[in-house]
Amino acid sequence: MKTSFDLNHAKLAADPLFGGIAHELGALSPINSRESFNRYCREACRLWNKAFPNGIGKTEQFAKLLSRIEHANDGVIRTGWGGVVITLHEHPRVEKYLIVRKNGYLALEMHEKKDERLDVHEGAGLILWRPADEQSLTVEVLRPGAEFHFQPGMEHCIIGAEDLLVFERSIDPKGMDQDLIFIYEPNAIASPVPSHAR
């Protein structure tokens, strides 16, 4: 399994709105340890918040879904970065919302057999992912309407630079959450005050 990743910021830099962030993040390549991964994700959030102190994304369903997670209802999974609301689980099909709090980020991960599609519904953030024919991780902005398809073996990571709501549809032959290969995980953080309550 590959554990050192150069980062390709060309797509991020192509948008004048994000060129400065791309330039500064370029100095943090490669990601080759848990420490460098966490430093990259934290710095991405810091630079984003400096560039966009009022944010650029809008949310409508985020607070309602986050409340479901915080009240630990059935069909939810609480995480350090926010949580998951499961809307369909008919093996091997899984559909769920990923509710990523501002400054939260998921592990850099891949799957052996799971095939997943992500649709960004609300908020804004970044995604790191490795296209099948590339060696580097591509860095792109996540905004409503963005879609991604990750075939088995494709590394990826979501960074919630702002509150972020992503819908995931997957075919998960091993069973839900049984095919998670973590390359680098977020450092443990204390649960922050929900962004909608600030």
Task: Describe the function of each predicted region.
Residues I158-G160:
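Asparagine-centered strand-capping/turn motif at beta-strand->loop junctions
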Residues K102, E112-A132:
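Glycine- and acidic-residue-biased ligand/ion/polar-headgroup-sensing regions
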Residues G153, D172, I189-H196:
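Beta-strand/loop edge motif enriched in small/polar residues
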Residues Y97, R117-D119, E162-P186:
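A short hydrophobic beta-strand segment most commonly corresponding to one strand
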Residues P131-E155:
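Short acidic-glycine-tyrosine-enriched beta hairpin
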Residues M1-V94, A107, E140, I183, ...:
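A short, N-terminal "cap"/entry segment at the start of jelly-roll beta-barrel domains
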Residues V94-K114, L142:
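Conserved short histidine dyad/triad with adjacent acidic residue
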